Amino acid sequence: MEKNGYKPNAITCGTILNALCKIGQTSMAIRLLRKMEEGNFELHLSVYNIIIDSLCKDRLVTEALNLLFEMMSKGIQPDLVSYNSLIQGLCNFSLWREAITLLNEMTQRKIVPCVRTFSILVDTYCKEGMLIEAKKVFDMMIQRGIEPNVVSYNTLIDGYCLQNKLKDAIEALNMMVERGCSPDVVSYNTLINGFCKKKRIDEAMNFFHEMSNKGVTPDVVTYNTLIGGFCRVERHKAALELFHKM
């Protein structure tokens, strides 16, 4: 491009940088960023956010944090997108303490967390088996006026099922419905799987009928889980009947 007498501008370089990150060429994107800095381009927050997110996806969270500090030293302040990428990156390494620190930091900066911010933290706590902490973050989200979505509820339901806290999982489903969030096939599949693992196949079937009555279409995961559940309790005839209904 430059050989033909055309000098790339910030928009051109930003587009290329975004493309590089999307194909996993983060190191090349950083080299382009350095060239942009050398060329005295006016760098916007969006450029840094693209690379921070890409570094986090590459599990290079330390490098992402360093870029955040570098960006801030240049007077460019992070936004919700910046923090969500970093919180996700930290949580991928189960660094939930550091993630909570960032949550507190963004609050101090008057940056309002969104449902994704809280859902990331709920998911991390659930995977760590820290259900009390997961519920606290979930409740904090509601207290701050942020309505959980189906992903948030499914994450909490899954956390309870993983720890065999099926009563709590049902309560989470009921709260979901009460607050006007419609359960989806994942919500029911998670509960059905939890009950099948505990050999409570009749209760699992109750959820199967409930989802059908509410217009939620069972998928192959639903049927496979229930068929496996019937086989686990040696009700092979029922398993075969369900197989023929697929």
For each predicted feature, which ranges?
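Pentatricopeptide repeat
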Residues: 9-14, 18, 29, 44-49, ...
